[in-house]
């Protein structure tokens, strides 16, 4: 009997430790900002201004753009296709305050409804201690009385300072052709970031992940792999935007174009990984293997 009680106590203790290890460390910061910590990773989100991700660090090393002119920094979330709102970004989703709720180990942020598009956004942040990622699940809720179509779209800005972008796709399938000098190597497409006098954007049908290596860090984002027919009209699973000059880059991914009935919602999850990246930012089998080891965790 004593042995049975001891085993039960040990199992309960292990269960508590596992639950503790999986708990998101959420801290209230200044002026409506919240931070999440997972091991060496820290993410800072600004609920007061569009629910934007302002910072993503490994220890003290930052991977996101920290420029401070509009639409040049951090990571945001929009509806797709863009032709339905064009420019500037919808203020209810990109600029205005989100309400905040802490639900156990999940940090939830919810937007207002835009009068034209009739969608409400919700962003849920948590950590995964087992695979050392930060997990973001985005929701789009149809608050209208009509059937509507939409796709989720994450836009992550990094500095253009000699980095390397790569993902699995044939380089000659990236469109429009010849806007960026993607090259095939090790069964992936690679682009050593450059600068030009004009803005450039390309599209690709990838395999559910997108990577960026620079300044000793490797950022990998994992999301649902789409069939070629699934993105919104004129859009793509993976997009890369280079702002003119040597300013910033947008690493973009999109989910499936979905029909939503009134009050129906879609959800789409992106896992963020950030690890040290030794050596030069150049194509290599070792770098591809490192990225895919994160994707396949």
Model-derived segments and spans:
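Boundary at the C-terminal end of the N-terminal hydrophobic targeting segment
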Residues: 19-21
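Extended, loop-rich substrate-binding clefts of extracytoplasmic carbohydrate-active enzymes
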Residues: 23-28, 37, 81-131, 147-150, ...
